A protein has these predicted regions:
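Bacterial N-terminal signal peptides
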Residues: 12-23
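Metallo-beta-lactamase
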Residues: 28-29, 33-40, 137-190, 204-205, ...
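Conserved beta-strand hairpin/beta-sheet module of binuclear metal-dependent hydrolase folds
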Residues: 42-96, 199-211
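Active-site neighborhood of phospho(di)ester-bond hydrolases with catalytic His/Asp-centered motifs
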Residues: 78-80, 103-111, 130-133, 190, ...
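Active-site HxH/HxHxD metal-binding segment of metal-dependent hydrolases
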Residues: 87, 92-170, 272
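Active-site-proximal loop/helix segments of hydrolase catalytic cores
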Residues: 184-240
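Divalent-metal (often Zn2+) His-rich catalytic cores of metallo-beta-lactamase-fold enzymes
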Residues: 231-282
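C-terminal regulatory/interaction regions
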Residues: 279-321
Length: 321
């Protein structure tokens, strides 16, 4: 049964998750309110573009593209940012645009740069938090570690909420429509892709597609799920009629089809070369230093995340029939 191998794999995966997310540096003074900028990429769709370099003291972990959609009666927030303070800055940006109530916060997936600002919004009992039907389990499994890491980086004298309540999440399984007032948005849950619990948001009025981390722009894609099924999701995204888009990381001014073609090429390299490594009895420790390195100059933050992607692919594909 290769139990020793299974245990080693689980330990290595846990270590890699720790190394990935412990790099996030947080601080209370990420932005002054007036400097927290949002841009209107389509009528009623406002985006804060996160810092594009890797996590650093300078950008304080504010690296995700997050934002909000304004209807005639209320506002929907898409992702809450990397900390309570970043979430509060996003909330302040909303108030500079409109006084309409916030009726929905949609968390595209559990990763801390999208999740940990949630408590900036949940004090308002009139709003609803939405996420994938598998999101509550992921919050219960991961959020304590994320929050403890956040507190460590904030340092003494800063107070944070120590829990994110998974029971607040209204689960989405399939398609869910929300009317913000003469503006209907659709939340869609996906299968295994960037994670096993991604959702996207589409503003039907403007054709604006909020991809979360299903799609990256110039930033190396990050795999926390199944490489084969991720590519299938991207193929489906290529067939959507999208007028405007928001990706989870990176610039928003490149052609949509180019982004997907580049990302599918990278995942295809992972799939082909990891399978070949397994067939030739190349160890995981050797594979992470050989598979896919011809892609290095094509992606930002390659050195930070590529080995992790190889590891995730290897530990999945070694069990395929």
């Amino acid at each position: 049964m290769r139990l020793t191998h299974v245990k080693s794999t689980l330990i290595l995966r846990s270590l890699l998750v720790y190394l990935m997310f412990s790099r996030i540096v947080f601080a209370h003074d990420v932005h002054e309110p007036a400097s927290y900028q949002v841009q209107e990429i389509a009528q009623g769709n406002f985006v804060h573009v996160g810092a594009f370099p890797p996590h650093s003291l300078e950008n304080q972990g504010d690296i995700a593209n997050i934002g909000f959609i304004v209807g005639e009666t209320c506002v929907a927030v898409i992702d809450a940012g990397s900390s309570l303070h970043v979430g509060s800055m996003l909330k302040g940006a909303i108030r500079r645009v409109t006084e309409l109530p916030i009726c929905a916060v949609i968390i595209t997936h559990v990763h801390p740069d999208h999740l940990l600002g949630l408590n900036a919004f949940t004090s308002d009992n009139s709003l609803t938090v939405y996420g994938h039907h598998r999101l509550p389990k992921q919050i219960r499994t991961r959020s304590r570690f994320y929050l403890e890491s956040l507190e460590q980086y904030l340092g003494e004298g800063n107070t944070i909420d120590h829990t994110i309540d998974s029971s607040l999440v209204t689960p989405v399984n399939g398609l869910l429509s929300i009317d913000l007032g003469n503006r209907v948005i659709e939340i869609r849950s996906w299968g295994y892709a960037h994670t096993d619990h991604d959702v996207s948001v589409t503003d039907l009025k403007t054709g604006t597609f909020w991809a979360g981390d299903l799609v990256f722009s110039e930033h190396i894609p990050i795999l926390d799920s199944n490489v084969r099924q991720y590519d299938e999701v991207l193929e489906e995204l290529q067939n959507l009629d999208i007028q405007h888009y928001v990706v989870g990381h990176g610039p928003l001014d490149r052609p949509w089809d180019v982004l997907l073609t580049e990302q599918r090429r990278y995942l295809g390299v992972l799939l082909k070369e990891v399978r070949a490594a397994i067939a030739n009895d190349v160890s995981l420790m050797d594979a992470v230093n050989t598979v896919g390195w011809q892609e290095r100059e094509k992606w930002h933050n390659f050195d930070l995340y590529h080995r992790r992607n190889v590891t995730t692919s290897y530990t999945d594909l070694e069990w395929e029939d």
